[in-house]
Amino acid sequence: MQRSDPPRPLLEMRGISKTFPAVRALAGVSLTVHPGEVHSLMGENGAGKSTLMKILSGAYQADPGGEILIDGRPISIDGPLAARDAGVAVIYQELCLAPNLSVAENIHVGRELRRGNGRRGTIDRAAMARGCQDVLERLGADFGPNTLVGTLSIAEQQLVEIARAVHTRARILVMDEPTTPLSSRETDNLFRLIRQLRAEGLAIIYISHRMAEIYELSDRVSVLRDGAYVGTLERDALSAERLVGMMVGRDISGFYKKAHAPYDPGNLLLSVRDIADGARVRGCSLDLHAGEVLGIAGLVGAGRTELARLIFGAEPRVRGEVTLAGKAFAAHSPREAIDAGLVYLTEDRKRQGLFLDMSVRENINISVCGRDARLGALDLARGAQRARDAIAALSIRVPHANVNVGALSGGNQQKVLLSRLLETKPRVLILDEPTRGVDIGAKSEIYRIINELARAGVGVIVISSELPEIIGVADRVLVMREGRIAGELGGRTDAPITQEAIIALATGSRTEASAAH
């Protein structure tokens, strides 16, 4: 049987370089994408993925010497309009929609239909609504073209962006971390839509740090590292070890390895009994031992974050008792909890954790700056040294400590926030989605820090939606469902910590708890 030739590439980016003042962001990168393909693009933050896609979208101009070809023909993409005309559409993490306009108006933005005299005519909103109705139906939208975008959920707004791309007859669709704000069900719906678009012949460039998504969707995966092209793997050659090794340039066989000694079940550090908030948390109990990493898993909305905030004192509790190091503990504010040695890393670092318009040095020192007071004045030199030490200890990639946190990658922002918490010398550390939105290299550093803290006797609670992460770092796992502890895995129980067991408890398909909680 004669093998058919592979399809001609739809997109070829050859020898693309980009230099910013004092920084070479891309060095001769090439990428080839075929029609009807999901081609994933991976790399650590700062590897050059976003820069390469911004060149494709016309937001940046490449240095002289490279070229972009579509259907084998060289083209010039000198701006976003040229990219759109070439059939390129990009859906960024921060959706580019006008909330006060309708779905139809957002889909037609920049291409409004008008009555009468060309661009001077009045906008024909009825015609625009009719023009995009078929696209919305084709994509399975359950809202109409006249719906105000501001009333839609994030997942629905994302669908509007996809509808706009389809309506402009885009042939190349770039999706940058599209599942970050989505629930599990919304993610499943997005994947169904991606497969539909692939079957219709679109080329989809998919950027994600989540290995499970890469395995599920990708036909091929290309990896960038430090602004250079490393290689491309076919679907049947994918493995976590190969991909991560290509991304970070080193062996990661111990990526999730527990590098701390088994905890002492007789050394109880934190005890929580029947804690509730009257709404999302309905009577939860747990124990945490010195040197233990306790995982908390569950579906979105199960009450994991609410439980953490109750323990931390960020939300009032209606009942329940908490004991810390053998003493009754009832924090009425986060400050009281921090002073007692219990700290919490929020799942939303940008809104609730960091001061984005302040420097790395200021963010690291803000919780402990009172230690540096001398006769009413701050010892700035001491604070600066503390920041330098933290930057070195957590491998924070930053040119200097005075750069604004808002300018850093997600992984480095997370390490700055973690540094601030560690400066308080905690006995108990609660980490809520500690690696969300960070690259593989930063994840590895965060896992290393968790192990070091456990070795030092700190009790660590890790809340995560990534099951491989929970399984890899935790000594025991508690699974929440509908505001309660549904069961325990690992530890003193005979129940192994597996994805299947976690999902069964989280969904209620397995109702027996392995321990009474």
Swiss-Prot record:
- Catalytic reaction equation(s): D-ribose(out) + ATP + H2O = D-ribose(in) + ADP + phosphate + H(+)
The main enzyme category here is translocase
Q: Where is the ABC transporter domain?
A: 11-251, 263-507
Positions of ATP binding? G43, E44, N45, G46, A47, G48, K49, S50
Membrane topology term reads: Peripheral membrane protein
Positions the record marks as coiled coil are: none
Localisation: Cell inner membrane
Q: Name one Pfam family in it.
A: ABC_tran
Which top-level group of life is the source organism from?
Answer: Bacteria
Extract one GO cellular component term from the record.
plasma membrane
Keyword field: ATP-binding, Cell inner membrane, Cell membrane, Membrane, Nucleotide-binding, Repeat, Sugar transport, Translocase, Transport
Q: Where is it mostly found?
A: membrane
Task: Tell me the GO molecular function terms.
Answer: ABC-type D-ribose transporter activity; ATP binding; ATP hydrolysis activity
Q: How does it assemble?
A: The complex is composed of an ATP-binding protein (RbsA), two transmembrane proteins (RbsC) and a solute-binding protein (RbsB).
Q: What does this protein do?
A: Part of the ABC transporter complex RbsABC involved in ribose import. Responsible for energy coupling to the transport system.
Per the record, the similarity remark reads: Belongs to the ABC transporter superfamily. Ribose importer (TC 3.A.1.2.1) family.
Q: Can you say what this protein is called?
A: Ribose import ATP-binding protein RbsA
- Give the source lineage, highest ranks first: Bacteria, Pseudomonadati, Pseudomonadota, Betaproteobacteria, Burkholderiales
